[in-house]
């Protein structure tokens, strides 16, 4: 049986962490691509030398040539300018559209059948741009956002309630930004809803509201602390979870920025937006779940924000 090939476009902090996790989980051979001369090759050599220690036997190589994307089963895109202190994800729009054009054309010409995961910000717009330039079908391209945002939500809830994070199931929908929608109605601790915990006095409403707010600004909090970069351990872990579900046909239902068809969640057009999504060997399948009226209103705000950025992206492309 042929080994799978995972290509990571962007060999920075997230790309390097993705590569290490892919090796540890024995998902397949790894290619690290970056435009920086020598950097992906150096990281690949370093990672290759972990294999005897980790007890794994896979190939890792670095490259500056898009031809090396050929026959990739999975491509995870992190290439682009990262956030800096005081910078919103949306500030990155113009710069990273150009990056997505170059990367998209590289995918189109070398691995059009690959399963593509986009991590570059602003996420919901970049995955749209990446599809535009790559031509990858709706079911084979997805954005990583909700898995990360939900993990942050779960972490903050577990810390507040002093319980195992494994006991906390919490979900975030909508765009990957300030308008994201943490679903307090669906989320629970060992089967007990957050609403019930509030009623019982085990979780104060003001603390829940603060956790929701902190989740929305979770990425910015890390950027402010690091000062010279943005999060990479958790984003990489989220991307690998999605890739593993595809490669192993696990059919996990994860919150992701999938191409949601008009009619679902009140959409009047097809749109990449974060919703519960099944990821299998066939690709992605958005799922519609019941949400409260308040959450639906919040989701609409998030949808409108994504549409506005898509319009801004279209204007940039038209220049």
Swiss-Prot record:
Pfam families: Ldh_1_C (PF02866), Ldh_1_N (PF00056)
Catalyzed reactions per annotation: (S)-malate + NAD(+) = oxaloacetate + NADH + H(+)
Presence of keyword Cell wall biogenesis/degradation: no
Top-level lineage group: Bacteria
MF annotations from Gene Ontology: L-lactate dehydrogenase activity; L-malate dehydrogenase (NAD+) activity
Coiled coil (UniProt feature): none
Keywords tagged on the record: NAD, Oxidoreductase, Tricarboxylic acid cycle
EC number: 1.1.1.37
Catalytic residues (positions): 176 (proton acceptor)
Annotated positions binding substrate: 83, 89, 121, 152
Chain sites annotated for binding NAD(+): 10-15, 34, 96, 119-121
Reported function: Catalyzes the reversible oxidation of malate to oxaloacetate.
Family of this protein: Belongs to the LDH/MDH superfamily. MDH type 3 family.
Protein name: Malate dehydrogenase
Provenance organism: Francisella tularensis subsp. tularensis (strain WY96-3418)
Name of the gene this protein is made from: mdh
